[in-house]
A protein has these predicted regions:
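Short amphipathic beta-strand and strand-loop transition segments with alternating hydrophobic
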Residues: 13-17
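Phosphate-handling DNA/RNA-contact segment within nucleic-acid enzymes
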Residues: 18-120
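TOPRIM fold recognition
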Residues: 36, 90-91, 95-185
Length: 185
């Protein structure tokens, strides 16, 4: 199931449902609080005529860090910023009590997103899915200014399945966050 988060979290992030398309709706809010797009996640197993993820209202995802607006006060008061791939992971982390998280919308990151992360003043901790290699994370780290520390959570203990997100199970996330963090630069 996509969202096993509480109604309060879904309400705070304005998660909805479009019965016409059978998509869960995820409003994409930029860093100043403006609605810039709506992402949909097909409810159930999509057939050939439906995409699993689809922008119902298109936006430039490379100019947004999902969750920043909702978590901004927590981010300001934390030395670390957890950077994940998906919107779902931001919601899961909120459920686990981690309100210092944002999503890039995929395993790539834009220069603009790097600038947004840098402006927070936090040390970024990349917690991408298991299928993202350390080399890919090193490439991302190299996009940041030389003096900025960049960390990552890497599953060297093989706690995750191949396509699993570190946030899919709370006990696994806590173990990874506490025991599997490395400094990339």
């Amino acid at each position: 199931m996509l969202f096993r988060s509480s109604l309060a979290t879904q309400s705070e992030f304005n998660i909805g449902y479009d019965p016409c398309s059978n998509y869960i709706t995820i409003p994409i809010i930029d860093e100043i609080g403006s609605l810039v797009g709506i992402k949909g996640r097909y409810l159930g197993n999509p057939d050939e005529s439906h995409l699993k993820y689809f922008y119902l209202e298109k936006c430039n995802k490379s100019r947004v860090l999902y969750g920043y607006w909702q978590n901004k006060e927590h981010i300001k008061n934390n030395p670390y910023l957890i950077v994940v791939e998906s919107e779902k992971s931001v919601l899961k982390l909120a459920e686990y009590g981690y309100r210092n998280a944002v999503a890039t919308g995929g395993k790539t990151i834009s220069k603009y997103q790097v600038e947004l992360i840098t402006r927070t003043g936090c040390t970024p901790i990349f917690a991408f899915d298991k299928d993202v290699s350390k080399e890919e994370l090193d490439d991302i780290a190299s996009m940041f200014i030389d003096s900025m520390k960049v960390c990552a959570v890497i599953d060297n203990d093989n706690l995750l399945d191949e396509k699993e997100s570190p946030m899919d199970r709370e006990d696994v996330w806590n173990a990874l966050y506490q025991n599997c963090m490395i400094t990339l630069k």
